[in-house]
Curated annotation (Swiss-Prot):
Pathway: tRNA modification; tRNA-queuosine biosynthesis. This is S-adenosylmethionine:tRNA ribosyltransferase-isomerase. GO terms for biological process: queuosine biosynthetic process; tRNA wobble guanine modification. It comes from Prochlorococcus marinus (strain SARG / CCMP1375 / SS120). The gene is queA. It holds the Pfam family Queuosine_synth.
Length: 370
């Protein structure tokens, strides 16, 4: 792959999108969303085919392995009361140990170190919290919860009572149905503060049909946080750093991928977070996929050589986002922008509740592989 200097400029990943194409409601059934299939015919460049997510079943073959992110979205948005009776919104990001959590606050200027605040429910139950400090890197606050709620799994019951599902700001509503619809059907490990949105397209019927075709699946965990959804701001991307996110790739996933390779199958990632999980595990093993658990801040951008992932199902992402860099690493930035233009012309729906893009193994640039 020839690297263009423009590949490392944030402005090169901008595009115009009419707000009418930002999906406000999910498609039902899930697998009925549109899918832009990116592939390549012999002797020709990339081609785009307009399908539905259900049609992905016909593009896969027995022996392939679909790898998914099983993180579960927490009800991470909280309204808390200050001593003077006014309210501030907290957005939980990640645990910091001993019941302390990093939170974004809105408006943050109202919260100072030492302040006492209260979570309250409609049942008039109240739980006191305390602002410990400001976090310089994020502009957020370190908030002391009761020490019992020291990790993602332990705090989930509390958030079920006091919190709300953290829909992205471009979705201009909140509905009870989002409690279930903003989760993948296989979400099982609590900890994300945003959904791994490619997986939202996979219905129970789709997963059953997958199994009947002899296509296996495996689950990794990446708790989606700032590293995935925070907008990029620096124009020079050469030394880009992302906020770290917690990842686990278990031994059973490693075994499933090795078996897939042995039978000549292909590894298809469901979502960019799955790509980052697998590739980070591969790099941590010095070029050998091994079980991995820990924080990951891997940046995938043009020039990256993929060691594990052969194909990708993903959504259409926000302008100037790190996710566009990752997809560009697979198919090239100019190809990506051309495909996005076609999707816009064809009125595809964008972002979290929007339509999908499937980059088949044939559509991946040869130079993007090890």
């Amino acid at each position: 792959m020839v690297i263009d200097p423009r590949d490392f400029l944030l402005s090169s990943y901008d595009y115009e999108l009419n707000s009418s194409l930002i999906a406000q409601e999910p498609i039902e059934p899930r697998h009925n969303a549109r899918m832009l299939h990116v592939s390549k015919r012999s002797g020709e460049g990339l081609k785009a085919f307009h399908l539905k997510v259900w049609d992905l079943l016909a593009e896969l073959r027995a022996g392939d392995l679909l790898v998914m992110n099983d993180t579960r979205v927490l009800k991470a948005r909280l309204k808390v009361r200050l001593r003077n009776g006014t309210f501030v919104e907290l957005f939980l990001l990640e645990p910091k140990g001993q019941g302390r959590w990093l939170c974004l606050a809105k408006p943050a200027k109202k919260l100072r170190a030492g302040d006492c605040i209260w979570m309250e429910s409609s049942g008039e139950e109240s739980i006191p919290l305390k602002i410990i400090d400001q976090d310089i890197s994020t502009g957020g606050r370190i908030v002391q919860f009761p020490e019992l709620f020291s990790d993602r799994r332990k705090i989930e019951p509390l958030l079920e009572k006091f919190g709300e599902i953290p829909l992205p700001p471009y979705i201009n509503r909140c509905d009870f149905k989002d409690v279930n619809r903003y989760q993948t059907r296989y979400a099982s490990t609590p900890g994300a503060v945003a959904a791994p949105t490619a997986g939202l397209h996979l219905s129970d019927q789709f997963l059953e049909a997958l199994s009947q075709q002899g296509i296996k699946d495996a689950k990794v965990t990446l708790h989606v946080g700032l590293g995935t959804f925070r907008p990029l701001v620096e124009e020079n991307l050469a030394n880009l750093h992302l906020h770290s996110e917690w990842v686990e790739v278990k031994e059973e996933v490693v075994s499933a991928i090795k078996e897939c390779r042995d039978r000549g199958g292909r590894v298809i990632a469901i979502g960019t977070t799955t790509v980052r999980s697998l590739e980070a595990s591969f790099l941590a093993g010095d070029g050998c996929l091994k079980p991995f658990k820990g924080e990951v801040d891997l940046v995938i951008k043009p020039g990256y050589k993929f060691g594990i992932v052969d194909g990708l199902l993903t959504n259409f992402h926000l302008p100037k986002s790190s996710l566009l860099l990752l997809v560009s690493a697979l198919i090239g930035r100019e190809n990506l922008l051309e495909l996005y233009k076609e999707a816009i012309d064809q009125k595809y729906r964008f972002f979290s509740y929007g339509d999908a893009m499937f980059i088949s193994p044939e559509g991946v640039l040869p130079s993007a592989r090890l």
